[in-house]
Swiss-Prot record:
Keyword Glycoprotein: no
GO cellular component: cytosolic large ribosomal subunit
PROSITE patterns in UniProt: RIBOSOMAL_L19
Superkingdom field: Bacteria
Gene3D superfamilies membership: 2.30.30.790
The entry's keywords: Ribonucleoprotein, Ribosomal protein
Organism: Shewanella loihica (strain ATCC BAA-1088 / PV-4)
Gene name of the record: rplS
Protein name: Large ribosomal subunit protein bL19
Function (record text): This protein is located at the 30S-50S ribosomal subunit interface and may play a role in the structure and function of the aminoacyl-tRNA binding site.
A biological process from GO: translation
Upper lineage: Bacteria, Pseudomonadati, Pseudomonadota, Gammaproteobacteria, Alteromonadales
Family: Belongs to the bacterial ribosomal protein bL19 family.
InterPro entries named among the record's database cross-references: Ribosomal_bL19, Ribosomal_bL19_CS, Ribosomal_bL19_sf, Translation_prot_SH3-like_sf
């Protein structure tokens, strides 16, 4: 029974998900259906949380839009997600960056991780 569930989960998982973590700036392209039309909507922001649970993995992205903080949670292996692109690697010391909710401006900046 357990093997059947694992096999079904592995079948539904996406293989093209890039490696990213908290502090990274990502662009998530989401399929949006409006009326009868389908289009891609880009959501760019900083990953503030990531939850690794196989097929049920999720991550939260935060951005500032018109001076207002906007957060959106995505299921990593959702069929609605067209692509995930990592724009910038961030250097942080925490797994969850919920403290960014209280900060704005320069104090909310994240250092960039330099490749070796």
């Amino acid at each position: 029974m357990n093997n059947i569930i694992k096999m079904l989960n592995d079948e539904q998982m996406k293989q093209d998900v890039p490696e990213f973590g908290a502090g990274d700036t990502v662009v998530v392209k989401v399929r949006v259906v409006e009326g009868g039309k389908e289009r891609l909507q880009a959501f760019e922001g900083v990953v503030i949380a990531k939850r690794n649970r196989g097929l049920h993995s999720a991550f939260t992205v935060r951005k500032i839009s018109n001076g207002e903080g906007v957060e959106r949670a995505f299921q990593t292996h959702s069929p609605l997600i067209s692509s995930i692109e990592v724009k910038r690697r961030g250097r942080v010391r925490r797994a969850k960056l919920y403290y960014l909710r209280e900060r704005s401006g320069k104090s909310a900046r994240i250092r960039e991780k330099l490749a070796k």
